[in-house]
Amino acid sequence: MPAPYSDQRLEQLLQVTGFPPPTGFAARATAADPAVYEQASADPQAWWAGQARQRLTWDTPFTEVLDDTNPPFYRWFADGTLNASYNCLDRHVQAGHGDRVAFHWHGEEGEQRDLTYADLLAEVQRLANGLKARGVCKGDVVGIYLPMIPEVVVAMLACARIGAPHAVIFGGFAPSAVRERLEVSSARALITADGARRKGRTAPVKAAVDEAVEDLATLETIVVVRSAGSPCPMRPGRDVWYEDLLGGADGDCPAEPMEAEHPLFLLYSSGSTAKPKGIVHTTGGYLTGVASTMATVFDPDPERDVFWCTADVGWITGHSYVVYGPMANGCTSVMFEGAPDYPDKDIWWDIVERYRVSIFYTAPTAIRACMKWGTQYPAKHDLSSLRLLGTVGEPINPKAWLWYHAVIGGERCPIVDTWWQTETGAIMISALPGLTTTKPGSATRPLPGVSAALFDDAGREIDQGNGVLVLTQPWPSMLRTLYNDPERFVQTYFSRFGPRVYFVGDGARRDEDGYFWITGRIDDVINVSGHRLSSAEIESALVAHPLVAEAAVTAVSDELTGQSVVAYVTLRDGTPAEDVMKEALRQHVAGRIGKLARPKRIIWAEDVPKTRSGKIMRRLLRDIAEGRDPGDATTLRDASVLATLQQATAQDDQEPAGMPETGSKP
């Protein structure tokens, strides 16, 4: 059971400056030799080549490790071939592990399914053949818009088997966002569901998708999974039920060898403009990164551990540490369809106890929610199976870290606070649980083979203190480009400090021990519950409302969700500034992007701070929203707008805010 917890105990833990690895953990850890850091930094290419050969099975062994002749368009293991589906399925079955459970699936209403590696291999081969029969070929993009059900894994690996890059779309996105992602990727097929379940309610999915993709010329096939029992229309010739497609397909589909640089998937991430970024990850480098970090950071023993990453597969964390990382290592994982507070607030801990979860990976937002709900919920359950905890998605504050350590980990489990991005593909900065003395709130050190640094604005490295986080050497799992937009790729990531330095977009601090403390975004991306949302995309949604003349959004600190969205909105002349209008705008944003993007606060504004060139100064908006002096306003077109906004914000402070969305990324 969890260790007794009290405010007094928390105060005691806050005085502890570091938490060394437990002796027993260190003795059996995969990464237990401190020399691994020096070995990797002495020759990073040799290190990564060793990981690629050790962790993966290659059809054609590579002879060239890194081609860096055209930075920032790096190529890893380019003359090798392999298949991601084979590395996640076939080789484990061939090694005699076909009966090992790949996923304990737990449905929202308590349904349970165990899927073995052999089960998944059989279904993946049939779906792959079914897609080929519908005309899907190597290089064709396949959209996937599914809830957290086993078919989402089958769909991803079936695409990988035939070389069709998949583009998974988070199930919480609105149909219009789905259309945009399918359109810009020229997706040839979409795999979706009849409906989705959330907290006891069922929402139609297929019917909404139909409306969104009505005139999308490139989309030739929609495969529909019966998931929620929702009625939905089926268009003859285009639409096919999942079970019918599999039922008519041959059961043998050999995995096709893919060039290491062949795109494995696209994943659309929020940027500082309204257009989402289609991040491209390739087969050999991405698999090397996630297979290696899964093994070293989470230290799984496939024979006895049960791993649970609570992320949705629609986000990079789900790609890397629900699907590809665990499966490349032959692990047993948990997949959960529902929310952390349904049917009650102890459902996660019931699942941990039920399946004897030993490694648990979730987001600080979820931890803060559990803190708010109280220790009585985890105290109902036996959590003694846990031996390692992890966090992902945003920085975790020391208080939440220590609560996680004490209440969930029983003060015996190391915590790996992981920093990485959709763009990096795999974890970049994290403790190694058998080696690293952890500090609450710090991501600690770059992993072996990763070169991270802090720069000042002039590009000079900072040994200690605050700066801009950068990665100074290429790594295998890095994004290769933005889909059909190489110029934006260079401009976004490799223009500030040159083509050989990856600009992260996060600020950080490095302490006297060389530990990194991530301080947050320095661009216009808003991080709500670990979900990255584009300020420009939210503004575009608000302005699309017929009664809105202008909108500007910013992020403010939020105790529960890390950050929340505050929108300053100018209504068209004659529109009454009423509370009912605020709720209408929240619903409007939810309909165009998704509930996660709903502004927690909407403040009526006559104007917003802009430079003389018309650029919105969101930094000043954030200062005002958080009650700080906005400081120098000499670059503004009209500095008097600041006082007006401060007054409007102070007045709004007296009114209740909208409820935040605390969905799971995790």
Feature names for model-found ranges:
Residues E109-G110, A189-A260, G374:
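ANL superfamily adenylate-forming
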Residues E461-D463, V470-A536, V543-A544, T561, ...:
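Conserved ATP-binding/catalytic segment of the ANL
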Residues V124-Q125, G247, I279-P300:
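Conserved structural elements of the adenylate-forming
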Residues T221, I526, A552-E559, Q563-T570, ...:
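Conserved C-terminal "lid"/linker of ANL adenylate-forming enzymes
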Residues E243, Y324, A328-C331, S358-T362, ...:
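Gly/Ser/Thr-rich phosphate-binding loop
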Residues L287-V306, I316-S358, K372-Q376:
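Conserved AMP-binding/adenylation subdomain of ANL enzymes
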Residues S85-Y86, D99, F103-L157, A174-R179, ...:
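Conserved AMP-binding/adenylate-forming core of the ANL superfamily
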Residues D99-V101, V223-V224, R235-Y268, K275, ...:
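Conserved pre-ATP/AMP-binding loop-to-beta segment of ANL
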